[in-house]
Amino acid sequence: MTQLKTWGLLLALAVSLTASARKVKVNVQQPGTLEQQLPPKVRKSLTELTLRGSLNGADWHFLRSLMGISHDTTAVDGKLQRLDLSDATLHKSTEAFLFNYQIKADSILPQWAFYRCKVGEVILPRALHLIDSNAFREARIRRVVLPEKVSINEDAFADCPDLEDICFPKTLGSLSSNAIVGCEKLQTVRMNSVLFISGGGSIRDCSNLRKIEINGTLGHIDGWQTFSQLPKLTEIVFNGPVLSTGGSKEWLSQCPALQQITFNGPVLSTAFAGIADLPHFHNYVSLPNQVFLSKSEWVKGIPEQGPYTEETFKAFRQLQQSFEAFPDFHSEDQTFVTSAILNNFLAASAILHDKAGLLKYGRLILESSPRKLYSLLCDSIFNDFAGQPDFDALKEKSRQFGDYIYILKTSPQYERSEQTQQAFTYAFDSPILKKVREELKLDSIAGNGDEISRIKRVMYWLHDAIPHDGSSSWPQCKYNALDLFRHAQENKRGYNCRFLAEMLTDCYLALGYPARFITCESKEIGDPDCHVIVMVWSKTLNKWVWMDPSFAAYVTDENGTLLHPGEVRERLIDGRPLVLNPDANWNHKSKRTKEEYIDRYMAKNLYTIQSHLTNRPEIENEENSYQDVITLVGKGVTYKGGGRTTSDDQYFWQAPKLP
């Protein structure tokens, strides 16, 4: 009798039933109790469920069974057709709901949450910030309602064969690569405002999709295969303000039926280009005098010299208001998108001769991305403002962050030390290096001839053999030239500058040339954009020389004499000539110029210079290898990385003891 009273109380407090027991509302006040609140008799005919309260992994495991799928993804008898979670929240817990998958955050719909579930309509919790990867993979859903400001990860909606309607919120955060894939019944995608649409097939392989429409403000849309494999797509329409687009001839891929792309609102900046292999494509359509910055020959921008109509200024104000109305997102993409948009507003303000706008956006960029502002203000479109005190003051303030040669000139000087410091060593007799020399056939690669020619040939060989890939993951192998070479060949991959430099250092050491890979960093603490190059000792020149396998680059003086990094730094400071080899390049796809590579990139990254004291293969496979590094800094400069520091440049560039 007591047990019956308990069940009655639970149903009275937590469950509201229709006469047929098909529609149920449950308030899960204690995570993990959902199953207790839905007795077997209620579950049997349940088709519509509205949940409030907090759900943990155990609740989600049970919920999946109501949607016809078990813990191991086999089919079970579940009839649920509508699930309303709008007032529910997720509760981080250790209980697995599918295999080993758990609810790991209160604001993230976890991976595989609805995997293969059979439910007609889902209304997601309002508190969600992210729909994680594969959350709806292979789910038999027809309609899903997304919460405000949510972002969608890759493959979140992958291979959902019945999906007909995605009800987007008033403002979407980010739509990642491959977010909506293989949804064959989807015919129209209508988004409202959206912060960021990624390239790489954010909407892909939806065989019946005919129209993509964005009705609110668009923050940024990438320009590489953003929409792909959409054989029936005929139209893309932007009905609201567009703040930024990428662009290339491959911004769309395999969309053969596409006829037109329409901008029905103002456009701050676009680089959309003509699209290859679209036999039915007519053109881009945009409003006259409402595209402010265009890098596209297909979309006409406003003339830099004017004249401008009131409609143009009205459109610009609309873009400003749209940007300011964007909410704060719980998304890493917001910083990137905001930075690009502020840069665009700065340039557009200059073109419109809007000094107040220019100063406003310049100050915002100075706060958020100070390094960028100086290079932006050096563009010729700002020439008309030069000599005006407030503009000059802004530019001068930005100089200390973005004029890298000026930063070197004003940096603290080095100072000689009388103290005895640990010597740099070179492991010429390492058995690993002997193997590297033999199996990579380095003597054949270096060839005959003078020393400098041999040094260059080895650098060029590595540059050609393995591409530079700055975004690649760290390799899962021993960090010696032979294992890294094999790993790259077997996995058809490239390496970032660090591993290319480590490989080249091993090759030089194997051939008997003293060498170190050195990490060059900027003044800005936490700047991830450092660069790693090699310095190798030349007996002929009796000094170190600069070799960079990432860009097949070396630096000389005006007479063609090779320089080492310290000499390059000195010449940047005192203004003496520097020459970059004319064949310096990135993966044979784009050339590098002296202005780009030396004056900007390396000038930024020669503020501090770091090297290992012990130079041998696999040094960075070792735990606590940072204890073996020493960083050259100006006197009084605080370096927050690992290892020791020195301000004695003579010590840092000391000649090696030759074998």
Model-derived segments and their meaning:
Residues 502-577:
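Hydrophobic/aromatic-rich core segments of domains that either
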Residues 202, 247-300, 375-395:
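Leucine-rich solenoid repeat scaffolds
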Residues 294-388:
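Alpha-helical protein-protein interaction modules
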Residues 23-29, 47-55, 76-107, 117-130, ...:
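Structural signature of tandem-repeat unit edges
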Residues 404-495:
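Secondary-structure boundary elements
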Residues 565-659:
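Alpha-helical and coiled-coil interaction segments, frequently adjacent to or embedded
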